[in-house]
Amino acid sequence: MNAAERLWRGLARHDWEAVRAQFHPAAVIERAGDGAQLGVEEYLAEHRVAAGRGEEGEIEVLRSVVDGKAAVIEARVGERRCAGIYDLHDGRIAGAIEYWA
């Protein structure tokens, strides 16, 4: 299992320390829809708030594709979908872009 798959497993369990552990400290996560660029702590905070409000619902990974230093995850988050492209370096996520619909 790679860091992107562990990330989504942690998100599904609301295991915020496990989520944090998947990222390099300087990682930046871009949200393609609004152009937001989040640091790891901002990313965690957004997911914590959404989970606390019940906005995330059940999380299910539908597809995972890994090719060397990149991983692509398609996930269902409640009624929403996310496709994320994750750059992997030394077993952790160095950067990512997520597309939400």
Task: Describe the residue ranges of each PLM region.
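A beta-strand edge to alpha-helix "cap/lid" segment located at domain peripheries
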Residues: 45-101
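A solvent-exposed, acidic/Ser-Thr-rich amphipathic alpha-helical stretch
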Residues: 16-18, 25-65
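Alpha-helical interaction segments
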Residues: 5-7, 13, 33-37, 89-90
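Short acidic-aromatic low-complexity motifs
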Residues: 1-26
